[in-house]
Amino acid sequence: MANLTETAYYTRRTINWSILAVISYIVLRFFWSVFVAVWLEIFPPKPPPPNFRFGKLPALKFSEASPSAQFTYRLETIVGNVPVASESAAVYFMPKPAANLLALSRTQDFATRLGLDPSPIEETKSVYRFEDVTAPLRRLRYDIVSNNFILRYGFEQDTGLFSDRNIPGVDAAIAEGKAMLQTFALYGTDLSQGTSKVSFLKLVGDKLLGTTSLSQADAVRVDFFRKNVSGMRLFPPNPDEGQAVFVFSGSKNEKKKILQIAYTLWPIDYETQGTYALKPSSTAWEELQAGRVYIARYPTSAATNVVIRQVYLGYYDSFDPQMYLQPVFVFEGDYGFLAYVPAVAPEWVE
């Protein structure tokens, strides 16, 4: 009897100690995980040294020179100064599409599917125009090498089409744009994993200008933006313009319903990349102040003193072909101001 009591006693103690050990392990593991996370946040491991795989990079070519000398800048970030940026970043190869003997034939098929006359009109060695015999204001310009194109209906000469008010809402416009991209095999992961934005347009004279609501709109615009790369956003020359853009009217006529499709998407080889040293963010700030900057969006205010609220890294995705996807410092300020400064260390740019 004593042996049974003693056995039960030690069994209970063993169970209690086992439970305590398990609880202690869970608690200790939790606190260790928190400690490691906090430690890495405060003392992050240094990234591997840059490999400068492509040698010296060609200088970024921005769309046009921007007159920035008229502005003076004041820094008012959350931290009170220019945030310290990473010492290096990835640079990606952007392969140049090769000419293809079947390219023109495929483009003619594309034009036919859009309801255009497949007879090409040569504008340059790579750019062809296609007309619509039943809707003369509608035409397609297509680059058979890059596969970038713009389809447009000249609404300026036919403003009566806006009397129809069957304008798609936000969700319908996104769905319609997405469906068209999928139909023509243009909705790859670069766009499908990216973001979209809808804006409303109102006819003023013969121009479509931004307005605040669907009820006031004569057309709706959908911009599809490329996905982030290495956790950083891609910035076109115009940060409000996506790589794929649709403008829909409310017309019941199918050929007047789509006022514009603009598609400009240069390929990125995500498997071919190098790492490059970056200039300090403080140096980028000095270049901004000195006017060595591309202003992508001017402030809506007439003031010439711009307050900078955010400074961070992104990638510049030009509408013109460039050999490499390179990082830039992005400066965001009051009243919509946005500017880019090349980020790669100057000794690695030519």
Which residues does each PLM region occupy?
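Preferential activation on post-signal-peptide N-terminal prodomains/segments
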Residues: 1-211, 221-224, 230-236
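Activation/maturation switch segments at domain boundaries
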Residues: 2-4, 306-307, 312-350
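Sequence-level detector for tyrosine residue identity
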Residues: 9-10, 25, 73, 92, ...
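Generic structural hydrophobic/aromatic packing signal, biased to beta-strands
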Residues: 31, 151, 177, 222-224, ...
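A short, surface-exposed beta-strand/turn
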Residues: 139-155, 233-262, 330, 336-350
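A short local loop/turn or secondary-structure capping micro-motif enriched for an aromatic residue
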Residues: 159-160, 268-270, 348-350
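Charged, low-complexity helical/coil segments in non-catalytic cytosolic or luminal regions
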Residues: 185, 190-194, 217, 225-226, ...
